[in-house]
Amino acid sequence: MKIKIALEWFLNPDHLPMIAGLVTGKYKEAGIEVEIIQPKEHYDGFEDLKAGNIDIHCNEPLHLYEHHFEGIRSLGCFFETRGGVMIRADRVEKLRSNEKIKITTPASNPVTNKIGFEIIKRYADKNGFVIDKENVEFVEKDFWHLKNMKEDESFDGAWLCFYNFEGIEAKLEGFENLFIDQFESPYPNFSALEFMSTQSTIEKKGDAICKFIEVTNEMNKYLKNNPIEAQSIYYDYTKEQKNILMDSIILDTLIRLESEIKVDALRWRELYCFLEELELVKLNEQEYAKIWNTSHH
């Protein structure tokens, strides 16, 4: 049976579990034909999921709430990293002085900007200084955070950074920074990827989806134990030129793969409360409970 899965952005090492399932032929052995679709925009997958054009979408868990629609279901989280706002080391003083700061982000909209500011604000509260909302400007660029900061000195930082990407890249390049994640600022982490589907898809393809999760679970375990093999699987599939940065990103990504992909109603509960507090989402108890009521899986 065919399973169409849409990613949240371009193919990268976060998606290694699925890449491995394809390269090793394990999905095929389990009787499922998996097709990976890369989106044009970060949120494309939700429209496709709702319309039934795809069977599974992977995206950050906050979108289960923020892009909630009747029938959306979680299939479990397969990867979690540290994430947040990266500030150039030499601009931290500027931040502390409540001066105007400019931040590059792949998505500048009221929701992501509000979350980005809240993370900085909580960091400020924790460290005893004040930051005004009007002093933080989010400018929409693309996902190449470090490149954008290097090419444009006016950027003081970047928002929507994953440590296994930007953190590793900055470390390799000697780009000094303050990485404001959930350890620096008290907020619930959501830099993770969750498999999502819909009730109607689960009713139609429940067995195939179960198989998909089963094989992907196996791949996670295999990759974590075989880092060199994981690198060659990645290069084999993407046809990218082997390089030190990608090697390092892959190694850091592997330690962040989940040992077991499972539906967990409590895992992102605190995240839901955080988003509700920011008046970004509002679900009743029944709507919340239904997200995790993936009966067939």
Model feature map: region roles:
Residues 272-297:
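Conserved C-terminal helix/tail region of periplasmic/extracytoplasmic solute-binding proteins
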